[in-house]
Amino acid sequence: MRHVTLIQLFNHPITQKFVKRSGMAHAIACAFHAYKLSKKYNVNPDLATKAAFLHDIGHYTWYRNGKWDYNLYKQNDIHAIKGAERAHKLLIRLGEHPKSAKEIALAILLHTDSYLPQGELHLNPLQQVVALADEADEEPSGEHHYRTISDERARKMLAELDELVALALSQTT
């Protein structure tokens, strides 16, 4: 059973503020990639699409002399940490099951290793799907965060993805 849809997430003011700031078009593209990857890796598509959609909700833009500074961002990046907490609070507020909210938050926390010390990170399948979905939409120097999409188009795409997820879940139960 789905407690929260992508459209509900999209419509929330927190999502509007923070996901738009980090790139709504990128978030939606990642959610679609995650849906496809969830089938390949036998992962719950509801959790995968939500985690991919919210994976950059913790982004903060780093500026130097009034210009976006990608290197400064990379040096100081903790967006996955901030994003995991922000997404968890949002999901709980909207009525997501606590266990699902935790799984989604952990996938967001581990979708990138940009803030972790060097070493090998072992991800579970959901976490792998979210990381791969993000990588599938990356552009050099973070340009994927600056693609734009209208609210109307975003709602239409997320409604379509909500339908695909609901159908996939109905076929597994």
Placement of each model-derived feature along the sequence:
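His-Asp-centered metal-binding catalytic motifs of divalent-metal-dependent phosphohydrolases/nucleases
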Residues: 46-67, 83, 105-113
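Divalent metal-dependent phosphate-bond-processing catalytic cores, especially two-metal-ion Mg2+/Mn2+ enzymes
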Residues: 1-3, 18-46, 54, 96, ...
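Metal-dependent catalytic cores of enzymes that make or break cyclic nucleotides
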Residues: 61-77, 118
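A generic structural signal for nonpolar/aromatic side chains embedded in well-ordered alpha-helices
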Residues: 10-13, 108, 130
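Non-membrane alpha-helical structural segments and their capping/turn regions in soluble enzymes
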Residues: 24, 28, 74-81, 102
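An active-site-proximal "capping" alpha-helix that borders the catalytic cofactor pocket
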Residues: 30, 37, 77-94
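Active-site flanking loop/helix segments enriched in acidic
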Residues: 4-29, 64-71
